[in-house]
Amino acid sequence: MESAYLHKFLGTCLTEGLAELARMRPVDPIEYLALWIYKYKKNVTMEKQRQEEMAQLEHEREVALMEQEMMERLRAEELLFQQQQLEFQLELEEQEKERQRIEELERAQEQFEKELRMSMENMAKEDTLHGEDGADSGKTLAEISDRYGAPNLSRVEELDEPMLSDVALNIDQDL
């Protein structure tokens, strides 16, 4: 049982220590073996500590990479958010401009309708003042159509045209 324990827990250490003892052949082999085992244990502890530190450093490196990726994602999200805010603000400005343009058009339409009503009222007043006699007082169709909203008709002067009977007489004379 003691040999199994020694073999299991001290096998490699004792084997290497005895091999070193045989190679060096010190004056006091027991003291040399004790110091060698002490140094072996110290080296094993240092190696274990170094591996733990390496594992810790690897873990910290992974955490740093994850934090860096998270920061990049946050920056990307922030840029996207800023871009969306800018687009939203531009859209609001466009809507405001469109609303102002519509209000301006409505005001212009109201002004136009007001002027049209006033013009119609003025025409109605003129018609009532002149009466129906005034309408037959010699105004031509072109003069009547000069009012606001009436079609623009050009004046046509009448030329003296020969009558059909005059043309027939001329033909008879030629024969």
Curated annotation (Swiss-Prot):
GO terms for cellular component: motile cilium; radial spoke; Set1C/COMPASS complex. It is found in: Cytoplasm, Cytoskeleton, Flagellum axoneme. Its main location: cytoplasm. Transmembrane segments: none annotated. Pfam families: Dpy-30. It comes from the Eukaryota. Gene3D superfamilies: cAMP-dependent protein kinase regulatory subunit, dimerization-anchoring domain. The keyword Cytoplasm applies. Keywords: Cell projection, Cilium, Cytoplasm, Cytoskeleton, Flagellum. Functions as part of axonemal radial spoke complexes that play an important part in the motility of sperm and cilia. Plays a crucial role during acrosome biogenesis. Component of the axonemal radial spoke complex 1 (RS1), at least composed of spoke head proteins RSPH1, RSPH3, RSPH9 and the cilia-specific component RSPH4A or sperm-specific component RSPH6A, spoke stalk proteins RSPH14, DNAJB13, DYDC1, ROPN1L and NME5, and the anchor protein IQUB. Interacts with SH3GL3. Belongs to the dpy-30 family. This is DPY30 domain-containing protein 1. It comes from Bos taurus. The gene is DYDC1.
